[in-house]
């Protein structure tokens, strides 16, 4: 763990400190490798900022209860992050058979849900059908085909229809973590 911090304006915070606090609370299932992946991909900022999507954000990818101009403490950032991770974990448990998943697969899928949101991981809009349809990753998870599920994480690299380098890198890291410890089933 490199203890990476966010770049850019405003005060930064140490991901390693946030991981220690969250893991010490004992409430999340996501393992240390998963927390490192999420934390390093999201970065950590004490001061609120407007993200590229036009949403006020602070801490580690937190968009809930953000007050522009109000700097957060380590404890506040860790509490927000833990709540957001628990939301992502609930998605994986409820919709992707998370309780049956190996820990690394669960942690990687939690990272994807944290980043994309539950609905975007489960379904996408098909122009051809004129409606939202089930994603391949969701289909494989429902079958308990963890290797196939993991190998579909790189399907999610676009933002507004444009592939982003940062998402390609993150999804490949998620895929690698997801496959760690799995055997061909």
Curated annotation (Swiss-Prot):
It is an enzyme of class 3 (hydrolase). Its EC number is 3.2.1.17. Gene3D superfamilies: 1.10.530.40. It is found in: Host cell inner membrane. Residues 1-6 are cytoplasmic. HAMAP family: ENDOLYSIN_T4, SAR_ENDOLYSIN. All the periplasmic cyteines of the inactive, membrane-associated endolysin are involved in disulfide bond. In the active soluble form, disulfide bonds are isomerized and only the catalytic cysteine remains free. GO terms for cellular component: host cell plasma membrane; membrane. The gene is 17. Disulfide bonds join 13-44, 44-51. This is SAR-endolysin. Coiled coil: none annotated. It comes from the Viruses. Residues 25-185 are periplasmic. The active site is at residues 42, 51. Keywords: Antimicrobial, Bacteriolytic enzyme, Cytolysis, Disulfide bond, Glycosidase, Host cell inner membrane, Host cell lysis by virus, Host cell membrane, Host membrane, Hydrolase, Membrane, Signal-anchor, Transmembrane, Transmembrane helix, Viral release from host cell. It comes from Escherichia phage P1 (Bacteriophage P1). It is a single-pass type II membrane protein. The chain crosses the membrane at residues 7-24. Belongs to the glycosyl hydrolase 24 family. Signal-arrest-release (SAR) endolysin with lysozyme activity that degrades host peptidoglycans and participates with the pinholin and spanin proteins in the sequential events which lead to programmed host cell lysis releasing the mature viral particles. Once the pinholin has permeabilized the host cell membrane, the SAR-endolysin is released into the periplasm where it breaks down the peptidoglycan layer. The signal-anchor, which may also be an uncleaved signal sequence tethers the SAR-endolysin to the membrane until the latter is depolarized by the holin, resulting in the escape of SAR-endolysin from the membrane. InterPro entries: Bacteriophage_GH24, Endolysin_T4_type, Glyco_hydro_24, Lysozyme-like_dom_sf, Lysozyme_dom_sf, SAR_endolysin-like.
């Amino acid at each position: 763990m490199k203890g990476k911090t966010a770049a850019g304006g405003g005060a930064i915070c140490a991901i390693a400190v946030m991981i220690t606090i969250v893991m010490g609370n004992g409430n999340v299932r996501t393992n240390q490798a998963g927390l490192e992946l999420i934390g390093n991909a999201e970065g950590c900022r004490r001061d609120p900022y407007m993200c590229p999507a036009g949403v006020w954000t602070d801490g580690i990818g937190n968009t809930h209860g953000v007050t522009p101009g109000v700097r957060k403490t380590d404890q506040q950032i860790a509490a927000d992050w833990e709540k957001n991770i628990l939301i992502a974990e609930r998605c994986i448990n409820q919709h992707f058979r998370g309780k049956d998943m190996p820990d690394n697969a669960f942690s990687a899928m939690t990272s994807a849900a944290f980043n994309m949101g539950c609905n975007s991981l489960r379904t996408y809009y098909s122009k051809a059908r004129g409606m939202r349809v089930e994603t391949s990753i969701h289909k494989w998870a429902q079958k308990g085909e963890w290797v196939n599920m993991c190998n579909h994480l790189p399907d999610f690299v676009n933002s507004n229809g444009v592939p982003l380098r940062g998402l390609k890198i993150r999804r490949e890291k998620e895929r690698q973590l997801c496959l760690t410890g799995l055997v061909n089933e």
